[in-house]
């Protein structure tokens, strides 16, 4: 359909941003931020206690998931010109429904829809939409509503959708009734250009954007946190500044998620994973995330992606130690090398992104896989193979006392190329 998944003139690019909790990744200063032309990097994270206790912090990310890996059954195209520049409630619900179903499949509990969180999400999406519709914005903190130098007319309080400098401020300003609990904000910003003026529906984009959020470990942590139980989202579309409305469209998927500081009793003493045995259609590769999950390894995820990470958590444990990890491609009978992120091997130790001692990530290292199926990358590494089963097994030492073993198989969806 003339739509490509590359950061180039013909593209579909996605910018994912996650901020954990009422303590957002935004500065509280009212001074204008610099629009410096650099690519977005890590957000500054607040160490403050969001209303009651320190909340989970999550990152800013530049992952660009492919629509080719969408879990939606409906992939027919529609004219871009017919997509109105507005909020699309059915699309946002479709995206969050995907996340809720993924959680339920793994025994993590579903999400109930919250109108207050929806309002927060839609309003912030509209704030960003107003910026990108009316100016060239090269770099900014997507959680922040601070004024930007040179863009004062479309940012800060001059933006008609201004609702607070950071996520915590917006929760307080909205008198969100559950703001004393944990809360988080995740943002996926996608721009699509199609030479023939056709693209996927907002619903399909939202579902794929949700799937992309689940493929990035520092976003995944918040979205599959069993403590979270309420959500609201907005999927706002717009015509990018100075672009042709017949061939270009922007999509902003903003999600707010909240819950209790206490893990449900029926989950707290269980070893949980994502993906899990019931997971299908997961993304094959991770091409970018900030903070970088492979920091310090000299790996450029954009050219050398890794496979879909596996998250492990045991809420009731003080510590876990994961060992004897194996990931096997069932069809091809090959063993996938792995790296770990845990309390002993954490590239962001000492920062707000540090994993707690009762969580870990398995990172599949897919350098030897020729998983790309089409295009210029055909025969190269695109993470795990598409539409394939992967068996995961590991030992887990709990509180340095009890050793248990886990084994399950998950299935990937179509190959994603960025």
For each feature predicted by the language model, list its residue ranges.
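Acidic, low-complexity Ser/Thr/Gly/Pro-rich repeat segments typical of extracellular/periplasmic
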Residues: 300-418
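Functional surface patches built around histidine and acidic residues
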Residues: 23-32, 36-42, 47-316, 320-329, ...
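Generic N-terminal leader/targeting and pre-domain segments
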Residues: 5, 20-23
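C-terminal motif of bacterial Sec signal peptides marking the signal peptidase cleavage site
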Residues: 15-18
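Bacterial N-terminal signal peptides that target proteins for export
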Residues: 1-8
């Amino acid at each position: 359909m003339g739509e490509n998944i590359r950061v180039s003139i013909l593209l579909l690019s996605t910018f994912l941003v996650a901020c954990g909790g009422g303590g957002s990744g935004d500065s509280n200063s009212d001074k204008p931020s610099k629009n410096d032309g650099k690519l977005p990097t890590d957000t500054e994270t607040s160490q403050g206690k969001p209303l009651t206790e320190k909340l989970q912090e999550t990152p800013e990310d530049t992952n660009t998931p492919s629509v080719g890996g969408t879990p939606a059954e409906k992939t027919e195209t529609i004219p871009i010109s017919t997509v109105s520049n507005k909020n699309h409630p059915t699309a946002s619900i479709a995206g969050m429904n995907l996340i809720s179903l993924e959680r339920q499949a793994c025994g993590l509990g579903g999400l109930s829809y919250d109108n207050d969180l929806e309002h927060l999400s839609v309003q912030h999406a509209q704030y960003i939409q107003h910026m990108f519709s009316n100016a060239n914005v090269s770099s900014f903190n997507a959680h922040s509503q601070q004024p930007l130098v040179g863009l004062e007319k479309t940012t800060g309080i001059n933006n008609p959708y201004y609702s607070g400098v950071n996520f915590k401020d917006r929760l307080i300003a909205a008198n969100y009734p559950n703001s004393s609990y944990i809360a988080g904000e995740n943002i996926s910003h996608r721009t699509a250009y199609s030479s023939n003026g056709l693209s996927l529906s907002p619903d399909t984009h939202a579902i794929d954007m949700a799937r992309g959020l689940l493929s990035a470990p520092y976003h995944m942590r918040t979205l599959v946190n069993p403590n979270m139980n309420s959500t609201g989202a907005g999927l706002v579309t717009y015509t990018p500044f100075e672009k042709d409305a017949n061939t270009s469209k922007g999509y902003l998927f903003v999600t707010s998620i909240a819950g209790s500081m206490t893990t449900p009793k029926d989950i707290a003493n269980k070893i949980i994973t994502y993906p899990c045995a019931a997971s299908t259609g997961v993304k094959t590769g991770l091409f970018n995330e900030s903070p970088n999950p492979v920091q310090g390894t000299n790996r450029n995820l954009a050219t050398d992606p890794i496979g879909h990470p596996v998250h492990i958590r045991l809420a009731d444990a003080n510590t876990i130690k994961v060992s004897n990890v194996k990931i096997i491609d069932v069809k091809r009978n090959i063993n996938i090398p792995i790296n770990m992120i845990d309390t002993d091997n954490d590239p962001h130790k000492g920062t707000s992104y540090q994993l707690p001692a009762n969580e870990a990530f398995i990172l599949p290292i897919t350098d030897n896989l020729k998983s790309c199926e089409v295009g210029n990358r055909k025969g190269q590494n695109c993470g795990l193979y598409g539409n394939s089963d992967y068996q995961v097994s590991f030992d887990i030492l709990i509180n340095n006392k009890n050793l248990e073993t886990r084994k399950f198989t998950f299935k990937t969806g179509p190959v994603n190329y960025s």
